[in-house]
Amino acid sequence: FCLGLAFIGWSHTLYAQTISAAGNEMSFDDPLTVSPSTSVGGFCVYNDVITIGATSYDAIITIDNISNALISDFDVNNTVNSNSSSHFSPSVLWTSANGYITYSIDFIEDGSAGAPVPVTIGDIFLTAWDIDDVGPSGRFISSSGFSGYTLGSNTYLSYASTGLGVGTFQNATSGSNTSGTDGRSRVTLEYSSTNSISLTIGAIGTGPHTYLISGTNPQNWFPTTANESTIPTINTFGSTA
């Protein structure tokens, strides 16, 4: 069934209470929206993205912006290159240089997609896999509001920060060719408290690619080791901590 009309018009509201994920991972393996639109404004409702204690929460992924790109599949469900149904895996054709697509991931109470009730969840993770140099060059992901990130100690990615908890992770190693699970070509982002995540995928070059994004915090970074970084936070007096 389709939840298209019911979703229109809801707004993001930051609730004070944060529900800690407490080590629970997210999974995008149960989409409820049939044939979601691949144009700006298209969205998919995902059922039971995370369960904390005895309570499950849903998510809505929405396409906010598209530049120099065509989305061939909102979320590919296959096992190519270590993909799985639990990943959010948009398949994209970059039609011109410097293309990008921005998504929002909004967390809501279970079953409330008809009249979304936002929830604020803490201590959650997104991991972008296989950002190597095979396929469109200079592939990247960007996000905002993250409280920390993890890269491999000899990563193939560069990090450019444009603000506190705002930045881009991009393949910076020409010729790098890794498996889908290689720790050198991935990044994990942590969000300490949020009800909406902004996530951008993109590339400098052109051509097709399927992005692999999981709601996990993997511990195995073979053939490298994890290098974690924490983003300073601003307290009420304007200093950083």
What are these regions (language model features)?
Residues 1-18:
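Bacterial Sec-dependent N-terminal signal peptides
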Residues 18-44, 48-49, 133-232:
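Contiguous ligand/interfacial binding patches
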Residues 18-99, 231-240:
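N-terminal targeting leaders for non-cytosolic proteins
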Residues 89-101, 173-182:
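Extracellular beta-rich ligand/substrate-recognition surface
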Residues 104-106, 123-129, 198-200:
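Residues within well-ordered beta-strands of beta-sheet-rich folds
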Residues 112-125:
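Extended extracellular/luminal ectodomain segments enriched in beta-structured repeat modules
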